[in-house]
Amino acid sequence: MFPRLIVWLLAASAVHAVLDISNIKPKRDYENFLQKYAEYADDEVDRSVGSDITLSLKEKFVNQYLMDLKTEELKAGLKNPSQFIPSNHFFSVLDRINSSEIFKIIRRMPKGAILHAHDTALCSTDYVVSITYRDHLWQCADPKTGALQFRFSKESPKNTDTCQWTPVSEERKNQGEEQYNSKLRSQLSLYNTDPINRSRDVDSIWNDFMGLFGVNFGLLTYAPVWKDYYKQFLKEMMEDGVQYLELRGTLPPLYDLDGKIYNEEQVVEIYYNVTEEFKKENSTFIGAKFIYAPVRFVNATGIKTLTTTVKQLHERFPDFLAGFDLVGQEDKGGPLIGFSRELLELPESINFFFHSGETNWNGMTDDNLIAAVTLGTKRIGHGYALFKHPRVLKQVKKDKIAIEVCPISNQVLRLVADMRNHPGSILLANKKYPMVISSDDPSFWEATPLSHDFYMAFMGLASYHQDLRMLKQLAINSLEYSSMTLEEKTNAMKLWEAEWEKFIKELETEVFSLLE
């Protein structure tokens, strides 16, 4: 017995010794550290958005120039942090962005698609001001707030205690053109010279934000203007290097001078006809689709009305209607789970593109993210609170649910102050998470259709190491995660690639001339 015990103890000791040896940590070694550090750094670069792109020789040349400019801006920011553009409020640095060489390159760059933008917050403020020079336009001002309302009419609309109508042409003449237009501009966008101290919390900025839609309403819902406004945005979008659009809209009733009221189907028909007309006029324009996106402030009866409407639109415009969404401040509006029964009754051919997680709250409003993925949303609007939901994150990656990141919107609406702290930076660091960059309501912050958001993504959200490959991948993503069919995507990529090659060739020539 004892010999066996001794043998067993010796064997156990030997095994224990082997285990002890295997658990011995290597001594600290500088060369080993450098090797590990390089492995980690390379691995992080390999995981980031854009790492799958292989650049051509021409692209590499352009990329070197772009990265020299990026390095220069980043080093200047490191030296003087208060002057680093993405760490400041967009309104405070808009002029500096516009003069940035990086922005000028991004502005010219073919960026693919805008997948998140709203119907009456699209065009430049200059264009909206130009609309007020049209005939038959009347205005009134709220006696308490001074908020303007507009209406096109052959005769004066009916006056009320809070609304005394006068012709816009007379008001402009009486006040002086420059003064009138300056006051008007202040009610057409949130842009101001003291953005930090004005509207300091989420609710107050949202109140100001929603007020803009009220000023725009009577001005833009005049049927001839509605058509022109949409076509103008397609022009501005193309000038900004964007070839495709998926537009969210509430479909308000339109009117004309003869008293005709246009219903939802007629409004979508205007969108469709203008899109087809613009396609014929512009060979590089890929197209557009429409997402019906009414406000979320409805009861049980209201949501049934909305789902009935989207079914009718889907039957009438099966190829043009991309799907359905609910919009408005998530913190105040009804949660998705409250509408889930009615939403699940919609046919599966109607896709969802839900706004969700556009909030700083945790375990409250942001639970819309859980509802969105379990309802089968194809994309997530904003998804700012996404990283508070690990299960949702897992599903987003598995089902390739693209996150529509809108950096400037998130800053202006008080979710983030410094773009370097935007959670979208984590998405850019991990290519497994599908994402696109979009602009939300560019008109209301006097931004370009997409370029300003791309600039903030490149300089604020992205790593120092992320380069032209990231920008190219984001453009590709915008087409890949669109609601186009496979055939449409194939044709879209051909049109985009042709523009990309043209952009690279032109920029290469210009850089060569600078170096000579």
Swiss-Prot record:
EC code(s) of this entry: 3.5.4.4
Cofactor or coenzyme needed: Zn(2+)
Signal peptide segment: 1-20
Gene3D superfamilies: Metal-dependent hydrolases
Hydrolase found in the keyword field: yes
Keywords: Hydrolase, Metal-binding, Secreted, Signal
Matches recorded under CDD domains: ADGF (cd01321)
Cellular-component GO terms for this entry: extracellular space
Family that this chain belongs to: Belongs to the metallo-dependent hydrolases superfamily. Adenosine and AMP deaminases family. ADGF subfamily.
Function (record text): Catalyzes the deamination of adenosine to inosine.
Name of this protein: Adenosine deaminase
Naturally occurring in which organism (per UniProt): Phlebotomus duboscqi
